[in-house]
């Protein structure tokens, strides 16, 4: 039904891995965490199977230490999607969803495309992230150029 109606689903992958909040084994919270990670697998699997419009989302940007892990978190989506689908989700697909915010949209131009008049922030990556998605895990090493608002960093 979500896919038929064009509903967007913004998910954050909660996995039982190095980025998970460490909880005491056997505790009630640990049991809930295990259920949540199983639910993450189910949610992404169903989204992919039914072609639901899926956006990349995270709340780690508010913590400077966790923010450095965003690329690694994004790369983990290859558990359900191809590297090309992951990169498209984080760029063009998210831009498509953000464009739906109408008058609350703070961006005066198009997002997620490289064309005249668009707000095209760019990353130049050392290597091919479609062949090796792990390149986006280490921006200090692999991002050779970061362009934001036309300014190169």
Indicate residue ranges for each PLM-predicted region.
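Active-site core of metal-dependent hydrolases
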Residues: 1-38, 55, 60-61, 126
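A short helix-to-beta-strand connector/capping loop
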Residues: 5, 50-53, 142
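His/Asp/Glu-enriched, well-ordered alpha-helical/loop segment
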Residues: 37-129
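Short, small/polar residue-rich loop motifs at catalytic or cofactor-binding pockets
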Residues: 106-107, 139-141
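Short, Lys/Arg- and Gly-enriched loop/turn segments at beta-strand edges
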Residues: 130-135
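Short aromatic-centered micro-motifs
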Residues: 146
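Glycine-centered positions in the ABC transporter ATPase nucleotide-binding domain
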Residues: 149-150
């Amino acid at each position: 039904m979500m896919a038929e109606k064009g509903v967007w689903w913004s998910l954050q992958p909660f996995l039982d891995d190095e980025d998970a909040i460490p909880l005491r084994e056997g505790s009630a919270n640990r049991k809930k965490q295990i259920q949540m990670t199983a639910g993450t697998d189910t949610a992404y699997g169903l989204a992919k199977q039914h072609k639901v419009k899926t956006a990349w989302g995270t709340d780690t940007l508010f913590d400077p230490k966790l923010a450095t892990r965003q690329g690694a978190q994004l790369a983990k989506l290859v558990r359900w999607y191809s590297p090309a689908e992951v990169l498209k989700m984080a760029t063009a697909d998210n831009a498509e969803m953000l464009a739906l915010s109408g008058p609350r949209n703070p961006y005066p131009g198009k997002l997620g495309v490289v064309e005249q008049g668009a707000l095209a922030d760019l990353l130049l990556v050392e290597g091919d992230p479609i062949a090796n998605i792990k390149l986006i895990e280490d921006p200090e090493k692999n991002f050779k150029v970061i362009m934001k608002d036309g300014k190169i960093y």
